[in-house]
Amino acid sequence: MTNKQSNEDGTLSDEEIKWLVRRAKGGFSITTTAAANVTEHGRGWDGEMGVWGDHQLPGLTKMATQLNETGTVSLAQIFHGGMRAPQSINGVQPVSASVNTEAGMDGLYTRELTHQEVLGMIQSFTDAAVRCQKAGFHGVELH
């Protein structure tokens, strides 16, 4: 699920926060954010929220606080677009765990991650989870 309301730098807009808080006020026992990207160059679409940088913490904290005030369990859904991260949005060739023999987004083939890049991706997910915890979310969902 996504609503494409975040800013270009992955920070949350007030509209996006209000949208999700309305869901929580409706009585959902668990409220999960839209997919939030763990790296700047792994976005799957425009208007996607991010959790890759500390500059995103103020909005994430605002969202988590407002969600938690409703009594819902708040989760941030963290992910990387991988082979579905268009070069037209990210400016880099899409990546994957292995070579992809079929053209992906924008008609391009994906590039296989190196071992060091896989380790870096794991660290990006870890950093994003810690950032979400600092913001006040109850947990994360790995997408």
Label each PLM-derived region with a short phrase:
Residues M1-H143:
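Flavin-dependent oxidoreductase catalytic cores
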